[in-house]
Each structure stands twice: as structure tokens, then as C-alpha cells.
Regions:
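Sec/Tat-exported extracytoplasmic proteins
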Residues: 27-34, 79-82, 102
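Lipid interaction determinants
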Residues: 84-137, 141, 148-207
Length: 207
């Protein structure tokens, strides 16, 4: 019930740690803070535990800030995770560096590195100054439309941390497709992991 959650950007990494039920509560909390009265009684009862909740109207998307509306859309994407569906099949097309922009600036931004032996890494934007964690390393599997990232190691500026208990990150994922950009001048392989699109690159992901 802490409304300060919404004062800073909530990353895909944070959303990936939450269950679909937790995501539903987080998404609806955005409407609850404006006094939205829900049709679902469990939501009304839950938010009634907080003194800031004053249900007196129906709140529409147009009443949200752009940051709040974008977060609702991103949470909704994560809520599409279905591990019990037939699994998306990937071959060699998933191997490589998946970068969050189709054109790389002067250095790498957020990227996933996926290897042929089911190893996976997530490396944080090089422009970020002193992130607490700069790299997540482990292995992955695909269940339904969900990439399950079993994090085994964390890398900080000072050390590599071997986790005693594996940390699970769960991202919705789409099949690989091809996109043409810049009026046909650039073609990239594209995949959606979490709420963002990533584009295929090769090379050294740590330069």
C-alpha cells in the first residue's frame, strides 16, 4: 500500500520478480489511489486497509499521468505470462546479443546475451552511473510464452556474488521476427522480452 512506489520508474527486472496476482494488485493500485471503486470486491476490501483509499468514482485511463498509464500498459504485458500454454520454440535464431535499441549509441544500453547452451545474461545500460548490480548471469528455459531466467550470479562494481538460492525472473517473450527500419535502410531481427523490444547484435557485449 506504499504509494511512493510510483514516484520512481519500476523496471522490468522488478516486474519480472512478481507473480501475475501481485501484478494485478500493483496495476489496480494505480487506479485505487485516485479513488476508483472496483467491481471486484477483493480489490475494494484490500485497498480499504489503507487510509489513503477513498472509493468514490470510476477512474478512466485519461485521468492517469503518462508515467502511470505507461506502467499500466507494461504491467498488463507481464500479466500475459502463461507457463502452461504450449511453449514457444526457439532455434539458433535466439542466440546473440539482444539490445534495447536497433541502433547502438556510443556504448551498449540494456541487453540480454543468450548463448547456445541455455546460458543467459542481462547487462545494465553502460550509461548508468554506479548501478547496484551491473550484470545478472544464469540459465533459462521457455515455458509457454514465458522466459524463466534462473539467476545464479550477480556482478557489482566490486565483486561477483554467487547466489546461495537461485533468483527467478519471469518475462513474457515473443517469437523472433524481422523489422525494417529507416525507410528500408536497416533490417534487424527483433524479439520482445518483458515490456520492451530488443534487437539482435553480435560482438563483445561488455565493450
Amino acid at each position: 500500500g506504499d504509494l511512493t512506489l510510483f514516484t520512481e520508474e519500476i523496471s522490468d527486472l522488478e516486474l519480472s520478480k512478481m507473480t501475475n496476482s501481485e501484478l494485478r494488485l500493483l496495476r489496480n493500485m494505480i487506479y485505487a489511489k485516485y479513488g476508483h471503486k472496483f467491481n471486484s470486491e477483493d480489490l475494494n476490501q484490500l485497498y480499504s486497509n489503507f487510509n489513503w483509499y477513498n472509493p468514490n468514482k470510476k477512474v478512466s485511463d485519461s485521468q492517469l499521468t503518462k508515467v502511470e498509464f505507461d506502467l499500466v500498459k507494461r504491467i498488463t504485458i507481464f500479466e500475459t505470462r502463461q507457463e502452461t500454454e504450449p511453449s514457444i520454440k526457439f532455434g539458433k535464431e535466439i542466440i546473440g546479443i539482444w539490445h534495447i535499441t536497433p541502433i547502438m549509441p556510443s556504448t551498449w544500453l540494456d541487453r540480454f546475451v543468450i548463448s547456445s547452451d541455455n546460458k543467459i545474461e542481462f547487462l545494465i545500460d553502460n550509461f548508468q552511473k554506479n548501478p547496484k548490480i551491473s550484470e545478472y548471469l544464469g540459465h533459462y528455459e521457455i515455458k509457454g510464452n514465458t522466459l524463466i531466467f534462473y539467476v545464479e550470479k550477480l556482478i557489482t562494481k566490486k565483486e561477483t556474488i554467487e547466489l546461495k538460492e537461485i533468483q527467478l525472473l519471469k518475462f513474457p517473450i515473443t517469437p523472433v521476427s524481422e523489422v525494417t527500419l529507416m525507410n528500408g535502410e536497416l533490417t534487424r531481427k527483433r524479439i520482445q522480452i518483458g515490456s520492451h523490444e530488443y534487437f539482435l547484435f553480435f560482438g563483445n557485449p561488455r565493450i
